[in-house]
UniProtKB/Swiss-Prot annotation:
Species of origin: Arabidopsis thaliana (Mouse-ear cress)
Gene3D superfamilies: Aspartate Aminotransferase, domain 1, Type I PLP-dependent aspartate aminotransferase-like (Major domain)
Subunit organization: Homotetramer.
Keywords assigned by UniProt, alphabetized: Cytoplasm, One-carbon metabolism, Pyridoxal phosphate, Transferase
Entry protein name: Serine hydroxymethyltransferase 6
Length: 599
């Protein structure tokens, strides 16, 4: 039986001079239609227009106007031809559009209730099949949904498992981090900060982000009254640029370690030809300090001299390829003398800092940024720590910095710079994964792991030095080392390609030669990834032998073929020496499990 509903929805069009009319009688309608009440001022009062139903469900009418029941596509159409249910068609123009009305013959008010016996409403039989298709599509595995991508992913997994990973900025995450990254948290959008979101439904997302902030402070032993943290940046480069954008006006000055000296391009970098490479150098004025080319160490005397002349607003310490500890007291002294904010980019060594295997930057710096992967073993992203609360009474010889009761103003500026100035919604799956990694970073097991990372790097350095290899600064204080290949007549580009043929991954770097000329003859090597796979000092001594043999192969091939370009490099892929080394590397690497996978 059809369900009958009452409706007071009507659509009337009348002139401004029309007299008010009493409310027309309500017409009972079925739940598949709406009554259209045309204002009587459109027609003579002697012949009022009856209410007209607007059908919401598509119905079929035969040529004579008789009502037919609603049917499925494969249903037989059976019509009623009762005289009392037949209708007339009437055409008229409404707002410039031709319209057609159907009403009962004789001009009587047409009630849908009277026509209900000639109609039967049927649910589309295809709706469940369509729903099933959508559900099936949403539940496919990668292998089912995209075999091509699945194939590439499997090949990459095998590459990681069968090779030796020595790129200093890469690592293996744990299974819990990987599960969070691939979780349902990626579905939620959450622009803003906890408690102040643009979208609703973020009560649990807020709890996750607040917990992540608390764990970030705890991992580095920080008091929440003196330090704040933003865990939303998509990368450390984004974090660095957010600091610059929040604290500086365009064109103001920053000063960081030169890229060939081991700095990072996000600190502001120009090519030797003067091209501005990073956003920091495009929107702000940057000036580098450098290492002493004879020793490879930062020349702090020249740094102080340059800083006092240049007067940067932000002085940056930290880099991507500096193998020694940073002298934070000296940096603090220089920053105070020139009135600069002191910022440390600990992207490379944040894990060592958390494990107290490296000097603590938080005792001296105003702002600290980092990646969240690399030595932290978290997801790929960035993080910003900033001082809060009262400034020290005497922070600088600049009188403007000696007043008491002045609060740090970093928090609001940096948070606003991250969002809405530079980013949209944070990646909630990343923040949850970071919270997991930070919990692990505060554990005793993680501290043992980072201690082993440092031991392994030193063992690798000693093994290379024993083979007469030249290391920048003569060794390492952290997880990475720089190998100067110029005595072997090699460039970093050629050497990394030969290593890749042997299933060893390292990365080329530019270095300063002893005469102060920038050379592409360096390679950076790091210990975190293979430490994560369970390798200890003896295994890193074996890896040193693999690296040295790869250098000998590359040097011999270069002597035979001349300067190795792309095509000659391809030609040596199948040579016996490389094939033998590749097989030995694979046999060695596959002894050690790949974290997060049963392989």
């Amino acid at each position: 039986m059809d369900r009958i509903a009452q409706s007071d929805l009507s659509l009337g069009f009348g002139s401004s001079h029309a007299l008010p009319l009493p409310h027309p009688p309500r017409i009972p309608i079925a739940d598949d239609s709406i009554t259209l009440q045309i204002d009587s001022s459109f027609r003579p009062s002697s012949n009022p227009m009856p209410p007209v139903p607007l059908q919401l469900l598509e119905q079929r009418f035969d040529v004579t106007g008789s009502c037919s029941r609603v049917v499925e596509e494969d249903d037989e159409v059976v019509g009623d031809n009762d005289d009392d249910d037949q209708r007339e068609e009437e055409q008229f123009i409404l707002l410039g559009h031709p319209m057609k009305l159907k009403r009962g013959r004789g001009g009587n008010s047409y009630s849908l209730a009277s026509s209900s016996p000639c109609k039967r409403f049927v649910v589309d039989s295809g709706i469940e099949s369509r729903r099933a298709v959508v559900r099936a599509w949403g539940n496919q595995s990668i292998e089912e949904a995209d075999p091509e991508i699945h194939e590439f992913m499997e090949k990459e997994k095998q590459r990681q498992f069968r090779g030796i990973e020595l790129i200093a900025s890469e690592n293996f995450v744990c299974r819990a981090v990987m599960e969070a990254l691939g979780s349902h948290l990626t579905n939620k959008y959450s622009e803003g900060m906890p408690g102040a979101r643009y979208y609703t439904g973020n009560q649990y997302i807020d709890q996750i982000e607040i917990l992540c902030q608390e764990r970030a402070l705890a991992a580095f032993g920080l008091n929440h009254e003196k330090w704040g943290v933003n865990v939303q940046p998509y990368s450390c480069t984004s974090a660095n640029f957010a600091v610059f954008t929040g604290l500086l006006m365009p064109g103001e000055r920053i000063m960081g370690l030169d890229s060939p000296s081991g700095g990072h391009m996000s600190h502001g970098y120009y090519t030797p030809g003067g091209k501005k490479v990073s956003g920091a150098s495009i929107f702000f004025e940057s000036f580098p300090y450098k290492v002493d080319p004879r020793t490879g160490y930062i020349d702090y005397d020249k740094l102080e001299e340059k800083a006092l002349d240049y007067r940067p607003k932000i002085l940056i310490c930290g880099g991507s390829s500096y193998p020694r500890d940073w002298e934070f007291p000296r940096f603090r002294h220089i920053a105070d003398k020139c009135g600069a904010v002191l910022m440390f980019d600990m992207a490379q060594i944040s894990g060592l800092v958390a494990a107290k295997e490296s000097p603590n930057p938080f005792d001296y710096c105003d702002i600290v940024t980092s990646t969240t992967h690399k030595s932290l073993r978290g997801p790929r992203g960035g993080i910003i720590f900033y001082k809060r609360g009262l400034k020290p009474k005497k922070q600088s010889i600049n009188l403007n910095h000696c007043e008491s009761n002045i609060q740090y103003d970093f928090e609001e500026k940096i948070n606003f710079s991250v969002f809405p100035s530079l980013q949209g919604g944070p990646h909630n799956n990343h923040i949850a994964a970071l919270a997991i990694a930070l919990k692990q970073a505060a554990s005793p097991e993680y501290k043992l792991y980072m201690r082993q990372v440092k031991k392994n790097a030193k063992a690798l350095a000693s093994a290379l030095i024993s083979r007469k290899c030249k290391l920048i600064t003569g060794g390492t204080d952290n997880h990475l080392l720089l190998w100067d290949l110029t005595p072997l007549g090699l460039t970093g580009k050629v050497y990394e390609k030969v290593c890749e043929m042997c299933h060893i991954t390292v990365n080329k770097v530019a270095i300063f030669s002893e005469n102060g000329v920038i050379s592409p003859g360096g390679v950076r090597i790091g210990s975190p990834a293979m430490t994560s796979r369970g390798c200890l000092e003896p295994e890193f001594e074996t890896m040193a032998d693999f690296l040295y043999r790869a250098a000998q192969i590359a040097s011999a091939a270069q002597r035979e073929h001349g300067k190795l370009q792309k095509e000659p490099l391809k030609s040596i892929y199948h040579c016996k020496e490389i094939a033998d080394l590749r097989n030995q590397v694979e046999a060695f690497a596959t002894q050690f499990a790949m974290p997060a996978f049963d392989m």
